[in-house]
A protein has these predicted regions:
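E1/E1-like adenylate-forming module used to activate ubiquitin-like modifiers
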Residues: 1, 5-6, 125-189
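A structured beta-alpha segment of the ubiquitous adenosine-cofactor-binding alpha/beta core
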Residues: 89-95, 99-123, 130-133
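N-terminal charged helix/coil linker that caps or initiates catalytic domains
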Residues: 1-37
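Hydrophobic/small residue at the entry helix of a nucleotide-binding pocket
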Residues: 45
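Hydrophobic Val/Ile/Leu positions in short beta-strands of Rossmann-like dinucleotide-binding domains
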Residues: 39-42, 63
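Conserved S-adenosyl-L-methionine
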Residues: 55-60
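Glycine-rich phosphate-binding loop and adjoining beta1-alpha1-beta2 segment
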Residues: 65-99
Length: 189
């Protein structure tokens, strides 16, 4: 079915949905729209991932971070000057609402621990985008132990200024993937 969008006019939800179905094919679009993804850590990696998920049409995204936007974040994270001092969860939600207002966004302004991650029960995919190696390990071990039905995508060695050509994705085991350069340790970006 052909859908024409009037130039200069914001398309309706139905019009935008038809455009996305045509772009992805109905089967892929329906899978994306039904997806529920939690992004834990909304810094340089997590903020970019969340925005990409919203652009492709993932149906529900849970944004999780405890931090606020600082001036030092602006060179590598998806925030603007107007967001300085805001919770990263609220700032990123406002950005995603402008990109794709039809994505359901939930926010959790928390420091994630193994005691407070029951909310992950409601999602299909967990994306770990933390800076701290200890927090990465704790989250991954807890998810792998307590949420065996979830896909877990973790990061390793993604901070700093290194050769992006060496970044790869490895399947560690069923439903567990790590993306990174596998050479540099985790650290703040």
């Amino acid at each position: 079915r052909l859908t024409l969008i009037e130039r200069g006019k914001i398309p309706s939800k139905d019009e935008l949905e038809r455009v996305m179905i045509a772009r992805h094919t109905p089967n892929v679009h329906n899978k994306l729209k039904a997806g529920k993804v939690a992004v834990l850590g909304l810094g340089g990696l997590g903020s970019n991932i969340a925005i990409s998920l919203s652009r492709v049409g993932v149906g529900e995204i849970i944004l999780v971070d405890y931090d606020v936007v600082e001036p030092s974040n602006l060179n590598r994270q998806q925030y603007f000057v107007k967001h300085i001092g805001m919770k990263k969860t609220d700032a990123l939600k406002s950005i995603i609402d402008e990109i794709n207002p039809f994505v359901k966004i939930k926010t959790k302004d928390i420091f994630v621990t193994k005691e407070n991650i029951d909310f992950l029960k409601e999602c299909d995919i967990v994306i770990e985008a933390f800076d701290d190696p200890k927090n990465k390990a704790t989250l991954c071990n807890t998810v792998l132990r307590n949420f065996e039905d979830k896909y877990l995508i973790a990061s390793s060695g993604m901070a700093g200024y290194y050769d992006s050509n060496i970044i790869q994705t490895k399947k560690i085991r069923d439903k567990f993937y790590i993306c990174g350069d596998f050479e540099h340790e985790a650290k703040e970006g």
